[in-house]
């Protein structure tokens, strides 16, 4: 046994961490057309120009809450990979039950 724990099957060398790009302003990746498409799916005909930034901020808060809960479930199970079921349970915890992803 190489002392890698239960997940390590010799994948990679386990050396120094690579430099990661600093993540900021990723919320701008939710583009104006993407927000427009979501609104169209919801039945909206015309969209005010102020909606886009507001939508991004609301979406960011929502995702932060869901991801925080999902990571909590993942850590409790002593896993490092967030599964679809973690997200389903996180949404259920917030009162937004999601069907179709197991469980």
Curated annotation (Swiss-Prot):
InterPro entries cross-referenced by the UniProt entry: CENP-T/H4_C (IPR035425), Histone-fold (IPR009072), Histone_H4 (IPR001951), Histone_H4_CS (IPR019809)
Residues that bear N-acetylserine: 2
Subcellular location: Nucleus; Chromosome
UniProt DNA-binding region: 17-21
Region (Disordered): 1-20
MF GO annotations: DNA binding; protein heterodimerization activity; structural constituent of chromatin
Modified residue annotations for N6-methyllysine: 21
PANTHER family according to UniProt: HISTONE H4 (PTHR10484)
Stored Pfam families: CENP-T_C (PF15511)
Record-listed N6-acetyllysine modification sites: 17
GO CC, any one term: nucleus
Complexes and interactors: The nucleosome is a histone octamer containing two molecules each of H2A, H2B, H3 and H4 assembled in one H3-H4 heterotetramer and two H2A-H2B heterodimers. The octamer wraps approximately 147 bp of DNA.
Function: Core component of nucleosome. Nucleosomes wrap and compact DNA into chromatin, limiting DNA accessibility to the cellular machineries which require DNA as a template. Histones thereby play a central role in transcription regulation, DNA repair, DNA replication and chromosomal stability. DNA accessibility is regulated via a complex set of post-translational modifications of histones, also called histone code, and nucleosome remodeling.
Keywords, alphabetical: Acetylation, Chromosome, DNA-binding, Methylation, Nucleosome core, Nucleus
Keyword Nucleus carried by entry: yes
Modified residues (N6-acetyl-N6-methyllysine): 6, 13
Protein known as: Histone H4
Entry's family note: Belongs to the histone H4 family.
Stretches with biased composition (Gly residues): 1-14
Keyword DNA-binding carried by entry: yes
């Amino acid at each position: 046994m190489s002392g890698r724990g239960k997940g390590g099957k010799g994948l990679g060398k386990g050396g120094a961490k690579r430099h990661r790009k600093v993540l900021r302003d990723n919320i701008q990746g939710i583009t104006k057309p993407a927000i427009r498409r979501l609104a169209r799916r919801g039945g909206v005909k015309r969209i005010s120009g102020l909606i886009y930034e507001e939508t991004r901020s609301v979406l960011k808060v929502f995702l932060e809450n869901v991801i925080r809960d999902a990571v909590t479930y993942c850590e409790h199970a002593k896993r490092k990979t967030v599964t679809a079921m973690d997200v389903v349970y996180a949404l259920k915890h917030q009162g937004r039950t999601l069907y179709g992803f197991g469980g």
